[in-house]
A protein has these predicted regions:
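Transmembrane helical elements of multi-pass membrane transporters/channels
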Residues: 25-44, 147, 158, 181, ...
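Residue-level hotspots within the lipid-embedded alpha helices of multi-pass solute transporters
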Residues: 34-38, 71, 111, 115, ...
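Helix-terminus/linker motif at the lipid-water interface of multi-pass membrane proteins
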Residues: 35-57, 126-135, 191-200, 260-293, ...
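Small-residue-rich hydrophobic transmembrane alpha-helices
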Residues: 56-116, 155-174, 281-347, 379-401
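Hydrophobic transmembrane alpha-helices of multi-pass small-molecule transporters
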Residues: 68-71, 185-189, 215-219, 293-296, ...
Length: 466
C-alpha cells in the first residue's frame, strides 16, 4: 500500500468532501500569506536596524519573549479551529458558532491577563531574563516591550479570527488582511522611524497599530453573518460555555505546551551555540533564515490540514480523513522537494546576499545545503504530519512525542555531539555547528518515525473532540 496515494476507488468521487480545486483555493493563499510574512518580516528588520545596534538588540530580545505569547495564542486558535472544523463536518454550524464565541472569550481573557501581569512587572521581568545586557539595550527593550504587550489582545483576536475563517475554508480573507497589516507596519515604520525619528518607540507603535488594524478588520468580518456558517452572534451578551471551553482547551493546552517547550529548547540550543564563535553564530542565523523559506509549503499545508481532516473527522468520514491526510502529505513532499532543490542549487547566491566573512560564508553554504537535503526528506513527516493528527484531536500524542524528541535530540544530542567535537579538536567550531544541526536532524527522524507509525495504525482516528 502506498501511504501517500489518494485512491478515489475507495470512495466515489461524488462522495468526497473536498475537490482538488477546493484544496488549491485553501492552500495557495496560505502559502502566499506565509511567504509574504517572511518577506515583509525581512524588510521590517532592515528598517528597524536603522535605529542602531542598541535598538535592534532591544527589539530582538523582546521578540524572543513575545514569541512565547504568540505560540500560546496560536495554540488556542488551533484548538478553536479543530473544534469548529469538526462541528462543520458534523453539519452542526450552530455548535461551530458557539465554539467561535468561546474561543474569542478564552483568547481575550488570556491576552488581557498577560497585559495586566507584564506591564507592571516589565522591568523585573526583562532584568530577570536579560539582566546582563547593557543599559542602552535594556532601555530600548523596555520601550519596545510596552507597545508589544499592548498589542497582545489584538494579536489574540487576529489569530483566533484567522483560524476560524480557515476552518470554513476561507484563507483568502486572512491573506488580504495580512497584506493590509504589513502595509500598515511598513508605512508606520517609515513615518515614525525615518520621518518623526522617534526610534524604538516608532517601531513599537507600528507593531501595535498594524496588529490592531488587522484584528479589527477580521473581527468585523467575523461579526457579519452573510453566507458564512461561522460568525459571532450576540457579541454584546457575554456567554460562558464550560463544556465548549473544555473542548477547545483539550486541543489548545497540549498544543500550547508543545509550542512553548519547543521554543524554550530552541533558545537553549542558541545559548550554547553562542560559544562557538562569531562565524558559527552568523552561519547558523543565515541558515535558519534561508531554511524558513523552504518550510513555507509545509507550514501552509499544515494549517490547511486542520480544516480538511477536521471536517472529515466531524463528518465521521474516517476513510476520507486518511485519504486527504495522505494527499496533503504527498503535496507537502513534492512542494518541499522542489523548493529545497532550488535553494540547494542557488545556495552560494543566497548566502552571498548577506555580508559575511569568508569563514562564515563557507560554513553557512555547507550547512544550508545539508539542511535542504534533510528538509526535503525528513521535515514533512516531522512537522506537517502532526497537524493531520491534531486535526483529529490526537494532541496529547503529538505533544509527548515532540517534547521527548526535542529534549533528547535537539537539546541533549546537539550539546553532546558538538561539545565532543570541540573536546577532540578545540579549534573545530565549524564542525561543532554541524554537530548541532545533526542533533536536530535526529530529532526530525525520531518524531517523524513515530508520527508515521501513528498515522499507519489509525489510532488517531478515534480521538474525536466533539
Amino acid at each position: 500500500m502506498n501511504l501517500f496515494a489518494f485512491r478515489k476507488d475507495t470512495e466515489k468521487s461524488s462522495d468526497l468532501l473536498f475537490s482538488r480545486n477546493y484544496l488549491a483555493k485553501l492552500i495557495l493563499p496560505l502559502v502566499a500569506e506565509q511567504f509574504l510574512a517572511m518577506t515583509i518580516g525581512a524588510c521590517d528588520q532592515v528598517m528597524v536596524s536603522s535605529i542602531g545596534e542598541a535598538g535592534i538588540s532591544g527589539v530582538s530580545l523582546v521578540d524572543q519573549f513575545s514569541q512565547l505569547m504568540i505560540q500560546l495564542f496560536a495554540a488556542f486558535a488551533t484548538g478553536g479551529a479543530v473544534v469548529s472544523s469538526q462541528y462543520l463536518g458534523h453539519k452542526s454550524p450552530e455548535k461551530a458558532r458557539l465554539a467561535a464565541k468561546q474561543l474569542m472569550n478564552i483568547s481575550l481573557f488570556v491576552s488581557f491577563l498577560f497585559v495586566a501581569l507584564c506591564l507592571p512587572f516589565r522591568v523585573w521581568l526583562l532584568r530577570a531574563v536579560y539582566g546582563k545586557v547593557g543599559k542602552d539595550v535594556m532601555a530600548s527593550a523596555l520601550t519596545y516591550f510596552v507597545w508589544t504587550v499592548l498589542s497582545f489582545p489584538f494579536l489574540a483576536v487576529y489569530n483566533s479570527s484567522a483560524a476560524l475563517f480557515r476552518s470554513m475554508g476561507n484563507s483568502k480573507l486572512s491573506l488580504k488582511v495580512s497584506i493590509f497589516m504589513n502595509i500598515l507596519n511598513i508605512v508606520g515604520n517609515a513615518v515614525l522611524i525615518y520621518g518623526a525619528k522617534i526610534g524604538i518607540a516608532g517601531a513599537g507603535i507600528s507593531t501595535l497599530v498594524s496588529r490592531a488594524g488587522g484584528a479589527i478588520v477580521l473581527f468585523a468580518f467575523l461579526c457579519k453573518k452573510n453566507d458564512s456558517d461561522v460568525y459571532l452572534e450576540n457579541i454584546q451578551k457575554p456567554e460562558i460555555n464550560i463544556p465548549m471551553i473544555r473542548r477547545i482547551l483539550s486541543v489548545g493546552v497540549p498544543s500550547g505546551i508543545e509550542n512553548s517547550v519547543f521554543h524554550i529548547g530552541k533558545t537553549l540550543v542558541q545559548a550554547f551555540l553562542s560559544g562557538f564563535g562569531t562565524a558559527a553564530i552568523a552561519a547558523n542565523a543565515i541558515t535558519n533564515t534561508v531554511a524558513s523559506f523552504s518550510n513555507i509549503p509545509g507550514n501552509a499545508i499544515g494549517l490547511g490540514s486542520v480544516t480538511v481532516v477536521g471536517q472529515c473527522i466531524g463528518a465521521d468520514k474516517k476513510k476520507q480523513a486518511v485519504q486527504y491526510g495522505s494527499l496533503l502529505m504527498k503535496i507537502t513532499y513534492l512542494s518541499m522537494f522542489a523548493v529545497s532543490a532550488l535553494i540547494f542549487i542557488f545556495t552560494p547566491f543566497l548566502v552571498g546576499l548577506f555580508k559575511l566573512s569568508d569563514e562564515a560564508r563557507v560554513l553557512a553554504s555547507g550547512i544550508t545545503r545539508t539542511c535542504m537535503i534533510a528538509n526535503s526528506v525528513l521535515w514533512p513527516m516531522a512537522f506537517t504530519m502532526p497537524n493531520v493528527l491534531r486535526a483529529a484531536g490526537d494532541v496529547k500524542f503529538t505533544m509527548i512525542v515532540s517534547n521527548i524528541s526535542m529534549w533528547a535530540f535537539r537539546v541533549l544530542f546537539s550539546y553532546l555531539i558538538s561539545h565532543y567535537i570541540l573536546l577532540c579538536k578545540p579549534s573545530a567550531s565549524h564542525l561543532a555547528l554541524y554537530g548541532v544541526w545533526f542533533g536536530m536532524y535526529l530529532d526530525w527522524v525520531f518524531r517523524g518515525a513515530l508520527f508515521f507509525i501513528r498515522f499507519k495504525n489509525r489510532k488517531w482516528l478515534d480521538k474525536k473532540i466533539i
